[in-house]
Amino acid sequence: MKMTRHAPFEKLSNIFKDYPYIASAYLFGSHVSGKENQESDVDIAILIKGNAPRGRELLHEEDYLAYKVAKVLGAKEVDLIDLNSKGMIFQHNVLRTGNLIYDSDPAFRIKFETSVIIRFCDFEPTLRYLEGHQLQGRIGRYTRP
């Protein structure tokens, strides 16, 4: 996981610091893959510690945070994703392809990343097996006379 050091994203540290429950943030999606265009949104996954607000209060704070991030970056839209609440495959994809843009609690982040990687490695053979059977099913469906 590399730490991104681009001027616009460095400015985000000052915004994220106002939210002590955010352990780290990852930029992912088209802005990392180099496929962004004028219509692209900015995808940011945030890793939240246990001391975060709950329910509506958290949603309100995340919406306001997305607004502030969009304003700083000059982006039309920012998708702010709560990484904790997503599935293991999504989490692994963010860790594998994303760039770390904020890190206030490295110990918490490393523990989270380690857990995701271990769970993914345990599950990967099953995932590959399922993908193989799904592909065989599609091939069989389209090659029948």
Task: Walk through the language-model features, giving the residues of each.
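Catalytic core of pol beta-like nucleotidyltransferases
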Residues: 1-24, 32-38, 51-145
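Short glycine-rich His-centered loop
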Residues: 41-43
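Short hydrophobic/aromatic beta-strand micro-patches
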Residues: 45-49
